[in-house]
Amino acid sequence: MGSVTIRYFCYGCLFTSATWTVLLFIYFNFSEVTQPLRNVPIKGSGPHGPFPKKFYPRFTRGPGRVLEPQFKANRMDDLMNNNIEDPDKGLSKSSSELGMIFNERDQELRDLGYQKHAFNMLISNRLGYHRDVPDTRNAECRGKSYPTDLPTASVVICFYNEAFSALLRTVHSVVDRTPAHLLHEIILVDDSSDFDDLKGELDEYIQRYLPAKVKVIRNMKREGLIRGRMIGAAHATGEVLVFLDSHCEVNVMWLQPLLAIILEDPHTVVCPVIDIISADTLAYSSSPVVRGGFNWGLHFKWDLVPVSDLGGADSATAPIRSPTMAGGLFAMNRQYFNDLGQYDSGMDIWGGENLEISFRIWMCGGKLFIIPCSRVGHIFRKRRPYGSPEGQDTMTHNSLRLAHVWLDEYKEQYFSLRPDLKTKSFGNISERVELRKKLGCQSFKWYLDNVYPEMQVSGPKARLQQPVFINRGPKRPRVLLRGRLYHLQTNKCLVAQGRSSQKGGLVLLKACDYGDPTQVWIYNEEHELILNNLLCLDMSETRSSDPPRLMKCHGSGGSQQWTFGKNNRLYQVSVGQCLRVVDQMDQKGYVGMAICDGSSSQQWRLEG
């Protein structure tokens, strides 16, 4: 009897152990692993998955589900596994509500993104590493053909503390939209970044999900963009160097038009048209074809294209002479880059190098063109999110070197604006002066006469202004709705707290007066809300807790971009929140922003 009892006791222990083993297996495999990766699709890479497809031909599906190894979560990419589905409706990559905030974690990531990167990292992470962008080329570009013997390209991307998702979207756009036989390599130069995800995680990602032609070089100390690009170029072995910023997305057929011009003349440097990626919404939009210029403060500026450069049967697709380049995106024969003296290594970090190389190209026998059929999108930030390592004014230092080497007597134009800099140190320029002599370069007067005759000169060398530009002015956006912005529950209207013409003024709820034109809002195709046809409803992108204000319409979307969504909510695109009445029982009628929840405090209608 005792042996039977012991035997059944042992059976019970074995059964219990097996049961617990199965339960623990289910718990750990389906709770701890699957749950954080719930947005990883079974095939390919959906809009929310942290792991994109492996290197597959475009429009094909990727591998099966990836569970191991998981990348470590950290402060800069902790949204990569976040569920961003709207409770009411799934959000696609093209959704205007892709930046919607659902919880405090979303809000923290959005605010951190603006602080660290000066753009909306919440949306950037949700977009993933692959997305289609609109083909913004002129229709005539789409029928053009290019030689079959184009040179190969080394794409050099220098980055410092870049957002992980933005950097990888840059790289994937190049891989996805560049013929493999033309893309010799992509060289990523890490300029001693501080963020953890740009070190081991980036290396592991590249090894697992990108072709072997993608390489990373790591600077041991901060060198800056200028010397960082020189380091990348020194490692390159392709026939052409293509420099890109680390927050770009190349468009279709972007590389062939650049390479074709360089094949024809290796001493020609070419730039794509730089399309706009909004820092607030990451929406990709077309830019007009303009050319580079500068002012006597030695700052780059965009100019309209002279009438003389717009003629000809191929005017929509023909290369456009540009006195200067913006500097972030350009292509150049690698041997010519070295022969021409690369960059001035005495310049620090960033600033002025684009004008210096532009002057050197033109004055020393080369040419600089913008190619209308090549388009690359670039995130245009309103500020630089980081400074120089020791806080030095590198723009001034670099501009002084530029002025003393290349401007000849015209450097006095610069010093007339900055007399305080005449005695400021700028380092040893003897090598650059010797380079100019060795290359047999023209004078700066030759440059002004032959390349940039539109540039105005003050003093005894002043010239008459040449009215050679066409400026038709901006097209006014089409009006979609006109009426009063009515709050459904309080039966009141949103109006200016003071005068509707007061810039920076607050808005609040008051009794609707259908005879008062200052209560009338216009909603146009640019998604702007304009009160009394004067000022736009605007939100601070960096301080989402601030109330909305009336500001001058800037036409750039972002802080002034509003959409009417389901449940009558009024959604602010760059902030990712909805307009609400702060306290519906309070007679003061204050309004603010809050996480969109469809509550009665967030219900609005624009009606006549």
Curated annotation (Swiss-Prot):
Topology in membrane: Single-pass type II membrane protein
Subcellular location: Golgi apparatus membrane
Signal peptide range in chain numbering: none
One Pfam family this sequence matches: Ricin_B_lectin
Domain Ricin B-type lectin: 476-607
Enzyme's top EC category: transferase
Residue span of region Catalytic subdomain B: 319-381
UniProt xrefs under CDD domains: beta-trefoil_Ricin_GALNT11 (cd23440), pp-GalNAc-T (cd02510)
Pathway(s) annotated for this protein in UniProt: Protein modification; protein glycosylation
One GO process term, biological-process aspect: regulation of Notch signaling pathway
Keyword Repressor: no
Parts of the chain on the Cytoplasmic side: 1-6
Region (Catalytic subdomain A): 150-261
Main location class: Golgi
Amino acids binding substrate: D191, R222, S246, W350, R381, Y386
Residues in compartment: Lumenal: 30-608
Residue positions the entry lists as glycosylated: N428
Binding site for Mn(2+): D245, H247, H378
Function recorded in the entry: Polypeptide N-acetylgalactosaminyltransferase that catalyzes the initiation of protein O-linked glycosylation and is involved in left/right asymmetry by mediating O-glycosylation of NOTCH1. O-glycosylation of NOTCH1 promotes activation of NOTCH1, modulating the balance between motile and immotile (sensory) cilia at the left-right organiser (LRO). Polypeptide N-acetylgalactosaminyltransferases catalyze the transfer of an N-acetyl-D-galactosamine residue to a serine or threonine residue on the protein receptor. Displays the same enzyme activity toward MUC1, MUC4, and EA2 than GALNT1.
Name of the protein this chain belongs to: Polypeptide N-acetylgalactosaminyltransferase 11
Organism: Rattus norvegicus
Upper taxonomic lineage: Eukaryota, Metazoa, Chordata, Craniata, Vertebrata
